[in-house]
Amino acid sequence: MLKEYTQPVTKPIDGDKNVFSVVVERAERKPDEPLVSYKDGTGSWRSFTAAEFRDKVIALAKGLIARGVMPGDAVSIISSTSWQWAALDMAIMSIGSLTVPVYETNSPAQVATIFNDSQVTMAFAENDAQRDKIESVRSRCSTLKDVYVIDFGALNTLEEYGRGVSDEEFWERERLVKGDDLATIVYTSGSTGMPKGIELSHGNFVYVTYAGTQSMPDIAYGRDRRLLLFLPLAHAFARYMVLYCFAGDVELGLSNNLKTILSDFGEFKPSFILAVPRIFEKVYTAASQKAGAGMKGRIFAKAAATAREWSHAQQEGNGFSASLRMRHAMYDRLIYRTIMGVFGGHCEYAVSGGAPLDGAIAHFFNGVGLPLLEGYGMTETCAPAMVNPTKGYRIGTVGLPLQGVSVGLGEDGELCIKSRAVCVGYHNHPEITQSQIVDGWLHTGDLGDIDDDGFVTITGRKKDLIITAGGKNVSPGILEASVMTSPVVDQCVVIGDRKPFIAAIVSLDLDETNAWLAAQGVEQVSDLAEAVRNPIVYAEVERAVNAANDLVSRAESIRKFEIVPEPFTEENGLLTASMKARRQAVIDHFGELIDTRIYAPKGR
């Protein structure tokens, strides 16, 4: 490694425990305090105490034993985020079986591929629609025996099956599960190709859980610690956060409806939140649009500029001038407190991950009073590998390695990670395992840098690196993240490999575009095709592109862009399940437009 940094461990972490031990320890430590909260069918919040949740998991695990689920058997869950998902996951893993998560948005063909690759024997579907998806490919899944529907009382049925299983039989099964045993196979297709199953062990999860709580103790421990989780539990990061809450003092709130997320924030009042950058961009955009284009809009613009100025002064350690203090106090009363109220009024920190965080957005929220702590991780690292600390965080970096994690840079600048949390390997793909994990170092595929204090900066994606016809190396991520902060832009894909200049394909968000047009006091559009033709919308995209170009050199800047009237979706193959653009698929899909409109030969 050209450069290497290891974060020391303040307290030894026992990676030989199983995942269920985290639940047991919390139930012993704080048995009567709320652990998992959720909305019932009437919209009221209900809670399981730690002891109640532990007992629920045991009851479900007994049902699985009664139905013949054996150690090493794969059991799948296809459901939105819910307490049932979390409890089933724990029950499956507690008896040495493997949880195989499937996104609700996965196609029947993808379900069949995942079920066959992992040899799923039992599946839990949230509702009729998910059950029908499974049934449509059941004849192609030779190992699948049972399918249960959660909405039809599957968990009650499972508990009934388990009444004849003794406590001793459950604990005998649980004691056999060790840190080296597999806990789950998580399928991720990334932004390129077919799904790959990533094998994560109990030790992976336990190690990264306590590495996280020891790295960020002021978020994990203390009074009134609450997290409202609304990411899909099929995502490894969401499952990690469940364990992080259990290992600390955190009450976990679960929400599965983004349409009610703002009211959920207000009711649950989280002390911290976890979200992808797009959520924070949308909150900023909504606040800007609500202010409008008149006097209120000008006041908001000045308040936003003051927040960023405050954040820069804080980060640079230069102190705050009297003028800045006065303006900040004024805008705090007028605007900042309202924005903080969006997150429930008690939120102290927000953790951002999953995609690059635009610096302007990070500085805005930091100046408002909500530090956005950017982190970095992969499914292969059992979610987080590094995160900014609550004290001394540095905007523009993805923070420090978690305790016990080593980071290094390869000769080509590729970021590599070594820790007890690095995955066992790629299921049924030993050749990928051997090429991606070398001497314990996971090769992430991302380009980065490590400063003398151990803070890591991501500079691009190795496989996404664009080399123009003139030989200029361009990392598209910074340009794409900046363009996507525009209220009208949904996705941006920068192109230009082996081409004479850099260009971009931009898609629009129709609802956000109309909200923005209304805030400007102009007529809304009926569809994306009309939006593409709208000169006001075009001017806004052009402004966003110009702002992105200010961040890079002339040779790296976007010279041309095309706004397309087609949304990027999973259905048309242009988005992954985690809402990231599939770069090559976008290039192939819009190949004719790219060849004839962007890079048309001279004379045509």
Report the location of each language-model feature.
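Conserved AMP-binding/adenylation subdomain of ANL enzymes
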Residues: V206-L229, L233-Y336, H346
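ANL superfamily adenylate-forming
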Residues: T42, A129-G179, A287-Y336
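Conserved ATP-binding/catalytic segment of the ANL
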Residues: P401-T468, T485
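Conserved AMP-binding/adenylate-forming core of the ANL superfamily
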Residues: V36-M90, S107-A112, E159-R163, H202-G203
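Conserved pre-ATP/AMP-binding loop-to-beta segment of ANL
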Residues: P31-P34, V149, R163-Y187, M194, ...
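Conserved ATP-dependent adenylate/AMP-binding module captured primarily in the ANL superfamily
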Residues: D73, N106-S136, V208-L228, L258-F272, ...
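Conserved AMP-binding A3 loop
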Residues: S47-A51, A183-T209
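Structural core segment of the AMP-binding/adenylate-forming
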Residues: R67, S94-E160, E540
